[in-house]
Amino acid sequence: MGKPGFSPRGGGGGGGGGGGGFRGRGGGGGGGGGGFGGGRGRGGGGDRGGRGGFGGGRGGGGRGGGGGGGRGAFGGRGGGGGRGGGGRGGGGRGGGGRGGGAGGFKGGKTVTIEPHRHEGVFIARGKEDALVTRNFVPGSEVYGEKRISVETNGEKIEYRVWNPFRSKLAAAVLGGVEQIHMPPGSKVLYLGAASGTTVSHVSDVVGPEGLVYAVEFSHRSGRDLINVAKKRTNIIPIIEDARHPHKYRMLVGMVDTIFADVAQPDQGRIVALNAQHFLKNGGHFVISIKASCIDSTAQPEAVFAAEVKKMQADKLKPQEQLTLEPYERDHAVVVGVYRPPPKQ
């Protein structure tokens, strides 16, 4: 039986093997939208594979079902994880459908690590490729992600797979963003840190010389964040409302980059306030915008354009914008510079 201890009973027989181990005994009508593996029935094995990414069973087609891992970065061999490995479910942990474990980093396979053009980010090339960061705390994981150990020049280095379905920043990197402005040794103010999933990877990227100030308002997520920070000396957790930067001004020094993923209607203002307090002139910002959080009635494109206009008024000069398809719907990432020095 799979990890969660229940087994949704659909109509008809036919035992499908869902990714994360939901045995989905349903036949016929495919796995529910939540992506419990659809049975062997005619249905779309696992209806889009659900963003939870427990891959559809051996059923036909469905965007995440039997027909091979979808578009994502690490899909399983035979009907692997949801829209490409493992969606938010965490790197397709269960063996996807018929195939082997989604991810292809089973022992014995030769995995080579290449540096990504963003310093501190790497690509693991194996049976399937994945985005990885060098683990700051070897031997421990943060949210159940896969770890890969590679031996170079006699020393073992451990990397953690960075899942674009769980992290907006990873989605932006895989989407081809030009700059993330977080080289090793830089100081980053991270607004909307949640449980510390992405924060842990930023901590990997900036490395032992860098610092991540992680601001999160929710006490529930804050507890997880503090637990992540206990092991990672370069994360400073701040459980405070990002709307009131003066409350944590004693904790935060000047930073090189602000990353914001706050999903609030006034997030442009939140970033501007924090930039005025902590961002050095010529420093950069990376903002993840969720259109439906700002105006759920307008077209996403119109929302993004309006936000960019607001930023310009606050001396935040956007330099690039890209949407996060296929990893997130109606999300965009805007990267830019704060108070750029006048051109000579």
UniProtKB/Swiss-Prot annotation:
S-adenosyl-L-methionine-dependent methyltransferase that has the ability to methylate both RNAs and proteins. Involved in pre-rRNA processing. Utilizes the methyl donor S-adenosyl-L-methionine to catalyze the site-specific 2'-hydroxyl methylation of ribose moieties in pre-ribosomal RNA. Site specificity is provided by a guide RNA that base pairs with the substrate. Methylation occurs at a characteristic distance from the sequence involved in base pairing with the guide RNA. The keyword RNA-binding applies. Residues 8-107 have a biased composition (Gly residues). GO terms for biological process: box C/D sno(s)RNA 3'-end processing; rRNA methylation. Its main location: nucleus. Keywords: Methylation, Methyltransferase, Nucleus, Ribonucleoprotein, RNA-binding, rRNA processing, S-adenosyl-L-methionine, Transferase. It is found in: Nucleus, Nucleolus. It comes from the Eukaryota. Its EC number is 2.1.1.-. The keyword Oxidoreductase does not apply. Component of box C/D small nucleolar ribonucleoprotein (snoRNP) particles. It is associated with the U3, U8 and U13 small nuclear RNAs. It holds the Pfam family Fibrillarin. Belongs to the methyltransferase superfamily. Fibrillarin family. Residues 1-113 are annotated as: Disordered. GO terms for molecular function: histone H2AQ104 methyltransferase activity; RNA binding; rRNA methyltransferase activity. InterPro entries: Fibrillarin, Fibrillarin_CS, SAM-dependent_MTases_sf. By homology to other fibrillarins, some or all of the N-terminal domain arginines are modified to asymmetric dimethylarginine (DMA). It is an enzyme of class 2 (transferase). This is rRNA 2'-O-methyltransferase fibrillarin. It comes from Drosophila melanogaster (Fruit fly). It catalyses: L-glutaminyl-[histone H2A] + S-adenosyl-L-methionine = N(5)-methyl-L-glutaminyl-[histone H2A] + S-adenosyl-L-homocysteine + H(+). The modification Asymmetric dimethylarginine is found at residues 9, 23, 25, 40, 42, 48, 51, 58, 63, 71, 77, 83, 88, 93, 98.
